From Swiss-Prot:
<feature type="site" description="Plays an important role in substrate specificity">
    <location>
        <position position="229"/>
    </location>
</feature>
<comment type="function">
    <text>Catalyzes the reversible interconversion of serine and glycine with tetrahydrofolate (THF) serving as the one-carbon carrier. This reaction serves as the major source of one-carbon groups required for the biosynthesis of purines, thymidylate, methionine, and other important biomolecules. Also exhibits THF-independent aldolase activity toward beta-hydroxyamino acids, producing glycine and aldehydes, via a retro-aldol mechanism.</text>
</comment>
<keyword id="KW-0808">Transferase</keyword>
<keyword id="KW-0963">Cytoplasm</keyword>
<comment type="similarity">
    <text>Belongs to the SHMT family.</text>
</comment>
<keyword id="KW-0028">Amino-acid biosynthesis</keyword>
<dbReference type="InterPro" id="IPR049943">
    <property type="entry name" value="Ser_HO-MeTrfase-like"/>
</dbReference>
<protein>
    <recommendedName>
        <fullName>Serine hydroxymethyltransferase</fullName>
        <ecNumber>2.1.2.1</ecNumber>
    </recommendedName>
</protein>
<comment type="pathway">
    <text>One-carbon metabolism; tetrahydrofolate interconversion.</text>
</comment>
<feature type="modified residue" description="N6-(pyridoxal phosphate)lysine">
    <location>
        <position position="230"/>
    </location>
</feature>
<comment type="pathway">
    <text>Amino-acid biosynthesis; glycine biosynthesis; glycine from L-serine: step 1/1.</text>
</comment>
<dbReference type="InterPro" id="IPR015424">
    <property type="entry name" value="PyrdxlP-dep_Trfase"/>
</dbReference>
<dbReference type="InterPro" id="IPR001085">
    <property type="entry name" value="Ser_HO-MeTrfase"/>
</dbReference>
<dbReference type="InterPro" id="IPR015421">
    <property type="entry name" value="PyrdxlP-dep_Trfase_major"/>
</dbReference>
<dbReference type="GO" id="GO:0035999">
    <property type="term" value="P:tetrahydrofolate interconversion"/>
</dbReference>
<dbReference type="GO" id="GO:0004372">
    <property type="term" value="F:glycine hydroxymethyltransferase activity"/>
</dbReference>
<dbReference type="InterPro" id="IPR015422">
    <property type="entry name" value="PyrdxlP-dep_Trfase_small"/>
</dbReference>
Length: 417
C-alpha cells in the first residue's frame, strides 16, 4: 500500500533538484518561445491525477478494458468541449501530440506514395508538412511551397500553380513561424481545383481561434489538427477536429487507434477537458486579445530599433526577427539572450544563408509572457532589453545588467503567485 505522504523530495534528490531548478527557471526567465506557455494549477492537477493508472484502449463506450466508466466521463467532456470551442462536428482528443494528430490525419486521407503539399520547414512550416526527414516526406511524395522572399507572405498564386502542376491528394495549410492571417478559403479553393483534401494545422493558432479572434478553418477544411498547449494553454498533447463526414471520421478514429497509438493517456485527456473549459471563460478571450496586442507591440518596438521583422509585423502571437542585415546568427542571439534570462529560439528565415542548426533569425512569441500578466508597458521595456543585448551581443556587462532587470520584472509578475 502506498502512503499519501510519499514525496519525490525525500526519495530522489537528483530528480527533485532538477524539478526545483526548472521551476525556478520558469519563474526567473522571460519565456518568448512561441510554442510554450504556462498551464493552470487545475491542468497540473488533472495531469497528475489517478487517471494515469487507467488503461483505456478504444473509445468511450467501446473500450477493450473494463473499469472505464469514469475515464469515459473525462474523455466525453473533452470531446464535447472541443466541439463547442471550435464549432466542430467531430473531435478526437486521444492523439499524444500534434505530430501524432498529423500522422493519423495523413494516414486517414492518403495512401503511401500519394502526393501532399505543405509549407517548407525553412519558410515556417512544420516537420509533418512534408519535410524529407519526417514520415510525411518519406511515406508520401511531398511538394513544398514557400513564402515570398520580399514580403514574407504566402504566395497563393504559387501555391495554386504548384497544385495544378503536381495534383496533390492533400494540401496542408499550417505553420510554425508565419505571423499573418491565413486565407483558409483560398486554400479551400485551390484544393477543390485539383480535387485535393485540405488539412488545416492550427497548432499555433488554436487559442485565438477558440476565442473567436482569428478565422476558424474547421468548417472549411476537411480535417483540422492542433496541439493543445501553445496558445490554447493546455497540456502538451494533440487534437483532431473535423466537419461532418462519417467516412472521414471513421478513418480518423481507426488511424489514431489502433493505427498509430494504443491506450490513450487518460490523465492528459482529463487535463485537456479542464483546459477546454478554461478556454470557454470570458477571461480567455481577453487573454487572447492581449496576446496579439503584446506581439504587435513587441514587433513594432524591435522594428523601431532597426531590426527586420519578416512580413513587416504580425497579426497573431508570434513574429520572426531576420538578423541577416545585422550580421548575427540566430544561434548566437539565442545564446546571448539566454544568458540574460530571456528565452527565445533560433529560427530559419526565408532564404536563410545559414544551416538550420545556426539560422539567421529568432522567433518571438507572446503567449507565455501574457499569461504572466505582461501588457504593452512591460512589452516595450522588454523589447528594448532584447535590442540592447542584440546590439552588443558580446558585451557581458550589458547582458548582466539586462538579467538583473529581467529578474526584477519576473518578481513583479510571478507565474504561480
Amino acid at each position: 500500500m502506498y502512503s499519501k505522504e510519499m514525496r519525490i523530495a525525500s526519495y530522489d534528490e537528483e530528480l527533485e533538484t532538477a524539478l526545483t531548478n526548472e521551476a525556478r527557471r520558469q519563474e526567473e526567465h522571460i519565456e518568448l518561445i512561441a510554442s510554450e506557455n504556462y498551464v493552470s494549477p487545475r491542468v497540473l492537477e488533472a495531469q497528475g491525477s489517478v487517471l494515469t493508472n487507467k488503461y483505456a484502449e478504444g473509445y468511450p463506450g467501446k473500450r477493450y478494458y473494463g473499469g472505464c466508466e469514469y475515464v469515459d466521463v473525462a474523455e466525453r467532456l473533452a470531446i464535447e468541449r472541443a466541439k463547442i470551442l471550435f464549432e466542430a462536428d467531430y473531435a478526437n482528443v486521444q492523439p499524444h501530440s500534434g505530430s501524432q494528430a498529423n500522422a493519423a490525419a495523413c494516414l486517414a486521407l492518403l495512401a503511401p506514395g500519394d502526393t501532399l503539399m505543405g509549407l517548407s520547414l525553412a519558410h515556417g512550416g512544420h516537420l509533418t508538412h512534408g519535410a524529407k526527414v519526417n514520415f510525411s516526406g518519406q511515406i508520401f511524395n511531398a511538394v513544398q511551397f514557400g513564402v515570398n522572399a520580399d514580403t514574407g507572405l504566402i504566395d497563393y498564386d504559387e501555391v495554386e500553380q504548384l497544385a495544378k502542376a503536381h495534383r496533390p491528394k492533400l494540401i496542408i495549410a499550417g505553420f510554425t513561424a508565419y505571423s499573418r492571417i491565413v486565407d483558409w478559403q483560398r486554400f479551400r479553393a485551390i484544393a477543390d481545383g485539383v480535387g485535393a483534401y485540405l488539412l488545416a494545422d492550427i497548432a499555433h493558432l488554436a487559442g485565438m481561434i477558440a476565442a473567436g479572434i482569428y478565422p476558424n478553418p474547421v468548417q472549411i477544411a476537411d480535417v483540422t489538427t492542433s496541439t493543445t498547449h501553445k496558445t490554447l494553454r493546455g497540456p502538451r498533447s494533440g487534437l483532431i477536429l473535423a466537419k461532418a463526414n462519417p467516412e472521414i471520421e471513421k478513418k480518423l478514429n481507426s488511424k489514431v487507434f489502433p493505427g498509430i497509438q494504443g491506450g490513450p493517456l487518460m490523465h492528459v485527456v482529463a487535463a485537456k477537458a479542464v483546459a477546454f473549459k478554461e478556454a470557454m471563460e470570458p477571461a480567455f478571450k481577453d487573454y487572447q486579445r492581449q496576446v496579439i496586442r503584446n506581439a504587435q507591440a513587441m514587433a513594432e518596438a524591435i522594428q523601431s530599433r532597426g531590426y527586420k521583422i519578416v512580413s513587416g509585423g504580425t497579426d497573431s502571437h508570434l513574429f520572426l526577427v531576420d538578423l541577416v542585415a545585422k550580421g548575427l546568427t540566430g544561434k548566437a542571439a539565442d545564446a546571448a539572450l539566454g544568458r540574460a534570462n530571456i528565452t527565445v529560439n533560433k529560427n530559419t528565415v526565408p532564404n536563410d544563408p545559414q544551416s538550420p542548426f545556426v539560422t539567421s533569425g529568432i522567433r518571438i512569441g507572446s503567449p507565455a509572457m501574457t499569461t504572466r500578466g505582461f501588457k504593452e508597458a512591460e512589452i516595450c521595456e522588454l523589447a528594448g532589453w532584447v535590442c540592447d543585448v542584440l546590439d552588443d551581443i558580446e558585451n557581458e556587462t550589458v547582458i548582466a545588467d539586462t538579467k538583473e532587470k529581467v529578474l526584477a520584472l519576473c518578481a513583479r509578475f510571478p507565474v504561480y503567485g
